[in-house]
Amino acid sequence: TFGVDSGKWYWEARVVSGQHSFIGINGYDTKTTADRGGETAQDAMIRQNTGNLRTNGGDSSYGSSYSDGDILGFALDMDNGKFYVAKNNTWFNSGNPANGTNPGKTCLTRRTLAACAPYDNKSFHYNFGQDDTFRGAESSAGNSDSKGRGVFKYAPPSGFLAMCSKNLPDPTVPKGDE
């Protein structure tokens, strides 16, 4: 994936085998390991066996645990520094990314990317809009973002876009003499 420092982004991940794993976001320059997910202020990782949110190296109550086959939704609002997580289309902590209420994490200030820390060969299948069947494990739902991009199991929150290169702004490249 790639890191983002502005915009509102949505992606999903299906838990293939996630016992004791972490999944969420990391700062662009953060190293994550299975036993140390969410170690800095920029990071926010959901712990599989508890549903707690780990940030700054400590856990706080946030959501419910997830199991194999669950689909996690992630909404990252870099414009307002907020991060949300859903399980099977229900946002943890009664969060509402479209309205900006009850995020799991606030104060995101630097380039951030989707991340996971699988433990003991556990795995997730990510969907950044490329495959809402998660390699044929789910039936297609055909939800896309407001620009008609991506295909997701669950509808992205209003104002959030698929985290794909087509949704990135065009770069401004100065002329050679500037």
Predicted regions: what they are:
Residues 1-178:
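PRY/SPRY (B30.2) beta-sandwich protein-interaction domains
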